[in-house]
Amino acid sequence: MDEQHYVYILRCRDQSLYTGYTNNLEHRLQMHETGKGAKYTRGRGPFEVLYVKKFINKSEAMQEEYRIKQLPRFEKLKLIEFQEQE
């Protein structure tokens, strides 16, 4: 069975953006919502999923997560907008 890997961007209640990686998107989002996800997202829910990109390779997904995390906010918003247009 091929495992899928995802990079995602969430908008938090305080309008901040959180970028993450997972191999089980539904479960990870549930973890964020219940306060058991990343330390950054605790107390910042509810969340809106703004961006999801699927990978078949964990290494590529993690590289993309790192790349996105290095971007300034306006570049992340452009990335989200571009995906919405596809």
UniProtKB/Swiss-Prot annotation:
Domain of life per record: Bacteria
Ranges for domain GIY-YIG: 3-80
Matching Pfam families: GIY-YIG
InterPro entries for this protein: GIY-YIG_endonuc, GIY-YIG_endonuc_sf, UPF0213_domain
Similarity field: Belongs to the UPF0213 family.
Protein name: UPF0213 protein OB0043
Organism: Oceanobacillus iheyensis (strain DSM 14371 / CIP 107618 / JCM 11309 / KCTC 3954 / HTE831)
